[in-house]
C-alpha cells in the first residue's frame, strides 16, 4: 500500500511542480483542482483540502457547500499531458463537520460496496473488466438553441466522404456501414492514435492488453486488464481522460456517447464481473457452462434488477437509442454461454479462474463507480435470495419468432423508465448502507432534469416528419 510519505518522496524525485486533485461527480465527469507543490505536505494528506461543492450538480446547496477532498495516496500517478511536471491524485469526498465519507460521493459508494461484499462472507474481492467503446471524429458541430438545433459530424472514415474532395486527393479505403471490425490499415486509419492511447495509459499505471477498430466507422476500443472494483473504476476515469486528450493532440475529438450516428453500431461498455474468496474464484462449478450455483444466482440478481440498474449503467437519454434490436444491442434479459445476443453472457474459458459474467447492456456514459457498485449489489442480492435466472437461452435471440420473443423481459426503453424503475426498486442498493435514499433521490432528480430537457425540445427529425403536414 502506497503511503503519503512515499508519494511525497516521489514528488521530490520527479521534481513535481503541481499536484492535481481529481474527483468524480454524480454524472461521472472527472473534476479537478490543481495545488502548487509548496502546499502539498503530510498535513494535506491527513486533513484534506477544503472546496466549494455547491457548483457540483447533485451535491450540496450553497448554504452548506463546504466539502473536503481527501487524497488517496494509492492513486498517485504522473500526467504526461501538461507542460509543467504534474502528479495526479484521486480523492474521496468527506463531510467537513462529521469527517465521514460524503454519502453522495460516487467513489465512496464504490468503496462501501467492496466492504459490503467482504462483510457478506460471499467473497472478499470482486474483479471488474469494462470494455468501453468510443468514436473519434475530425470535426463536430452542434447547436441546441431554440431557433437553431442540430449537429454535424465528420470523419475521413465515414462512408459519406466517399466522394469528398481533399487537398491531397481522396484515397478511398474507408470502412462500410457496420464494416469496421476489423480490417488492417489503410481502411483502419487510426492505428497510430490508438497505439498512442495504449502507451499513455500504460505510463499512467493502467495495465493494458490490446486495441482495435470497432464495427462502426470512426469507432474504437482499447482493452485494459480486469482489476478490483474501485481500482478499475479509477482506471476507467483515466481511460476516458486519455482517449479525450490523445484524440485532441491528434487534432481530433473523441466521444463516449452511446449512439452519435443513426444506422450504425453504438458504443457499449460491456462489464465482466467475478467474485473471489481467499484467492479462489467462486463463479466456477458444475452447473451450466461450468458455473457455480452462486454465479447463476448472481446472474439472477442482475436480470431481476436490470431495469433499476439501467439508471446507473445507461444514464443518458442517448443510451436508449443504442438499446434497440438489430445493432448488436443486448436488450433481452436472458443469459447464455458465448451468445452475444443475450444481455448476460458467459465468455468461453476452460480455466476456473476465467469464469465470469459479462453484462452487456451498460454503456460508457455510466459513472463507473456507481454502475459497478450497483451491479455488484444486484448480483449479491441474487446470491443472498437464491434468485435463479431460469434456463439459459443458447439460440440467437434476435431471430426468435415474435410469440417467443414476447416472453423474454427487456431492458428499459428510455431514461425516464429507468429512473422510475430505480425509484421503485432500490432496496437491494441500500442494503448495508452502500447507497442511501438521499443519494438515490438526488440522482433521480439530477437525471430527470436531463429527461425533461430532452422531452421538451423539438427535434430536427420532427421537422422532417411533420413540418409540412
Swiss-Prot record:
Q: Where does L-glutamate bind?
A: 265-266, 322, 328, 340, 360
Please give the activity regulation comment for this entry.
The activity of this enzyme could be controlled by adenylation under conditions of abundant glutamine.
- Binding positions for ATP? 209, 272-274, 340, 345, 353
Question: Where is it mostly found?
Answer: cytoplasm
On assembly, the entry states: Oligomer of 12 subunits arranged in the form of two hexameric ring.
Q: What else is known?
A: Two forms of glutamine synthetase (GSI and GSIII) can be found in this nitrogen fixing bacteria, GSI is a typical prokaryotic glutamine synthetase whereas GSIII is a divergent type with very low sequence similarity to the type I and II enzymes.
Listed name of the protein? Glutamine synthetase
Q: Which organism is it from?
A: Rhizobium meliloti (strain 1021) (Ensifer meliloti)
- Recall the taxonomic lineage recorded for the source organism: Bacteria, Pseudomonadati, Pseudomonadota, Alphaproteobacteria, Hyphomicrobiales
Amino acid at each position: 500500500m502506497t503511503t503519503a510519505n512515499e508519494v511525497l518522496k516521489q514528488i521530490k524525485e520527479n521534481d513535481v511542480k503541481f499536484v492535481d486533485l481529481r474527483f468524480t461527480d454524480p454524472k461521472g465527469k472527472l473534476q479537478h483542482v490543481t495545488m502548487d507543490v509548496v502546499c502539498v505536505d503530510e498535513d494535506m494528506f491527513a486533513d484534506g483540502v477544503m472546496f466549494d461543492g455547491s457548483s457540483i450538480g447533485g451535491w450540496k446547496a450553497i448554504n452548506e457547500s463546504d466539502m473536503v477532498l481527501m487524497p488517496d495516496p494509492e492513486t498517485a500517478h504522473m500526467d504526461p499531458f501538461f507542460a509543467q511536471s504534474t502528479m495526479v491524485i484521486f480523492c474521496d469526498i468527506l463531510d467537513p463537520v462529521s469527517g465521514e465519507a460524503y454519502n453522495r460521493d460516487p467513489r465512496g459508494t464504490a468503496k462501501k460496496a467492496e466492504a459490503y461484499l467482504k462483510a457478506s462472507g460471499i467473497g472478499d474481492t470482486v474483479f471488474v473488466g469494462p470494455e468501453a467503446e468510443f468514436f473519434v471524429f475530425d470535426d463536430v458541430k452542434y447547436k441546441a438553441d431554440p431557433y437553431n438545433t442540430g449537429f454535424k459530424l465528420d470523419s475521413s472514415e465515414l462512408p459519406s466522404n466517399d466522394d469528398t474532395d481533399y487537398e491531397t486527393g481522396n484515397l478511398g479505403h474507408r470502412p462500410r456501414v457496420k464494416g469496421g471490425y476489423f480490417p488492417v490499415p489503410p481502411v483502419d486509419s487510426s492505428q497510430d492514435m490508438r497505439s498512442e492511447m495504449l502507451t499513455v495509459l500504460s505510463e499512467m499505471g493502467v495495465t493494458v492488453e490490446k486495441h482495435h477498430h470497432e464495427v462502426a466507422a470512426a469507432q474504437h476500443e482499447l482493452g485494459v486488464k480486469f482489476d478490483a472494483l474501485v481500482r478499475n473504476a479509477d482506471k476507467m476515469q483515466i481511460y476516458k481522460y486519455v482517449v479525450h486528450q490523445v484524440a485532441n493532440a491528434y487534432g481530433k475529438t473523441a466521444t463516449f456517447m452511446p449512439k452519435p450516428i443513426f444506422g450504425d453500431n453504438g458504443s457499449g461498455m460491456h462489464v465482466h464481473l467475478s467474485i473471489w474468496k481467499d484467492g479462489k474464484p467462486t463463479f466456477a462449478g458444475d452447473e451450466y457452462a461450468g458455473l457455480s450455483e452462486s454465479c447463476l444466482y448472481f446472474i439472477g440478481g442482475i436480470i431481476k434488477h436490470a431495469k433499476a440498474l439501467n439508471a446507473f449503467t445507461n444514464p443518458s437519454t442517448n443510451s436508449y437509442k443504442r438499446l434497440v434490436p438489430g445493432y448488436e444491442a443486448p436488450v433481452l434479459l436472458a443469459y447464455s454461454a458465448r451468445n452475444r445476443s443475450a444481455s448476460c453472457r458467459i465468455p468461453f474459458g476452460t480455466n476456473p479462474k476465467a469464469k465470469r459474467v459479462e453484462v452487456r447492456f451498460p454503456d460508457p456514459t455510466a459513472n463507473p463507480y456507481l454502475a459497478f457498485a450497483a451491479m455488484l449489489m444486484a448480483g449479491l442480492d441474487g446470491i443472498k435470495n437464491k434468485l435463479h435466472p431460469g434456463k439459459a437461452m443458447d439460440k440467437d435471440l434476435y431471430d426468435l419468432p415474435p410469440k417467443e420473443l414476447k416472453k423474454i423481459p427487456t431492458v428499459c426503453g428510455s431514461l425516464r423508465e429507468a429512473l422510475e424503475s430505480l425509484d421503485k426498486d432500490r432496496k437491494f442498493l441500500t442494503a448495508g448502507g452502500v447507497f442511501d435514499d438521499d443519494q438515490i433521490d438526488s440522482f433521480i432528480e439530477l437525471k430527470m432534469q436531463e429527461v425533461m430537457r430532452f422531452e421538451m425540445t423539438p427535434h430536427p427529425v420532427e421537422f422532417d416528419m411533420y413540418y409540412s403536414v
